[in-house]
Amino acid sequence: MTTEALDFYAYWNGAQVADLWTTLALITGTDDYRSLLLCVALFGLICAAAGAAVRYRGGDLIVWIAAMVFIFSAAFVPRVNIAVRDVRSANVQVVQNIPLGIGWPASVISRASYWLTESFETAFGDVDAARYTRFGVAFPQRVVTTMLSVKPITADGKMSLTNFTERCIVPEILENSVKRQELLNAPDINALISTNGWVNPARRVFMNNKVLTCTEAAEELKKTLEKTEIPALESRLRLKLNVDFKDGVNAALSTAIPQAESIMLGVSRTMAESLRQSLMMSAIPDTTMTFAAKVGQAPLSAGVAIARSQGNLASEINYRTLSEMARSALPKLRNILEFTVIGLWPMVFLMMLGTGTGGAMVCRAYFTLLISVSLWAPITAIINYLTLHLDMEPMNQLVNS
């Protein structure tokens, strides 16, 4: 627990949660809200006095007043500070002057939820890339989907990759069935085409304002990708994978993406190697289709299109819905619920104060709802673990086959 502040854990929306607490502190600290409390208390007192007079039970009025004074003195007058901790970015924002009636129970519930989530993930023993608290739901699956869709985004990278594949790779796989099969089974296409004799050294290609043999062009392409294309793709991946870290996205992704690919595909390579492989996997079918269209081989073009659609079908079926749900629906729905429940506290407190002895029932219903909303984190961590390990086996079998 932060010194002189109660911890409240947020998941990827720490700034917004801190704004919510700040707004709540401002609302409950205004004279207008205090005037509203006074009006509600007086109206409740009048109703309680009328009820006690009708029933000839003056003791009920005394109990009602005592309950109202206790609720106000215990839940509203004392103030605490809340330290909003964003689990993923590790940012901490302290918000002052939060009423004890919402600050303390919300902090206790949030810390209990975070402890449960961490306990489950520690017991599961997965790497960081598979942890819900680190990267969100289905991160390894989202990595596979994203890497399959990687395409060059810089002009130099796109031109160099297109020229090389069209001049040096496509002729080889069309003329030699053995090389075509090697390319299909290669875990590292760049390493394969760089081997001595795989590309024809007699062929020439124009790349980076130079005419190079295919052997020379393979090395030149590798340098171009490492210098311009891969750094640009690394920054783009932060947006596609919804990853944002205070210590830098490159450091986070350079570790997480190899871990995710190791889990789902059973391969071990660096992030740069993964991006090079993905670029080649997307460039070769595209260039083959372009080449087929140029030479008028419609059956070849249709065959490439069918092969691509079949290869992507499993990924589309298994991961598109899940990744979209993980990236947008679940976090938004959960954030709306949390914001609504916490933001309603000023109104709930008015009802607690106005009902006097009935405030306990209002309090119980409200905090039951708050506990239910807070349980989403450990439950989602369990669902993430089950989903990940259910997908691991078929994906590894698909790759190994």
Language-model features: where?
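Hydrophobic alpha-helical segments involved in membrane association or supramolecular assembly
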Residues: 1-401
